[in-house]
Amino acid sequence: MKKLLLIAATSATMLSSTLSFADGMDNEWYLRIGAGAAMFNKEKDEATSVKLKSNMTVSVDLGIGYYFSKNFRTDLTLGTIIGGKLKKSGTATNVPFSGTNVSVSYKPTITRLLINGYVDLTNFNIFDVFAGAGVGPALVKEKITYNGITGLASTTKNRTNISYKLTLGTSAQIADDVKVELAYSWINDGKAKSKNVVYQGQKVQIGGMRYQSHNLTASIRFDI
């Protein structure tokens, strides 16, 4: 947690310094609220070798941003996911679980703080098309359950990773000082912590799942 606060403070300082540089420009701040759907990439449980699939989860974020020019803006966003899960039932092939029918579930908790930059690629009368990228710290932990194998269920501690985000979207003005946007984003939040447990006298590594997601988000921006 201390590491996340340190990185957050550094991010805020960088954003503040950049805004001070642009103080002489006639630009505006904005608030951004977004929500949408997300799906994680398919991954494999290392303990059993069962390949896991993602459910459809909800992503939300809240941010404050600044227009540096007509075609460039940046914002600082705090985001998380709600109800995300990687799960699958199958037959384990790894020792000591070989031949065991098991249902595996990974439920992550992810909180990320990102500095994002966006550039308008086109400017039409009705809408704009933009591309963007973001980077910042992410706290990642997971709850792991194994139905069919006793003694493996576990919850890992938070791990601080560097999260990366790539975005392509479109925006339109619907009222004075109000814009809506629809965007696709790919986000890499890194790996959760792994841990060793003893099962029938053997050490078994569980956890350590990598979380990469595809996101479709609808947002609204209020100029302030």
From Swiss-Prot:
Highest taxon of the lineage: Bacteria
Classification via InterPro entries: OMP/PagP_b-brl, OmpA-like_TM_dom
Signal sequence extent: 1-22
GO CC terms of this entry: cell outer membrane
Keywords associated with the record: Signal
Annotated Pfam families: OmpA_membrane (PF01389)
Name under which the protein is recorded: Putative adhesin A1E_05320
Organism: Rickettsia canadensis (strain McKiel)
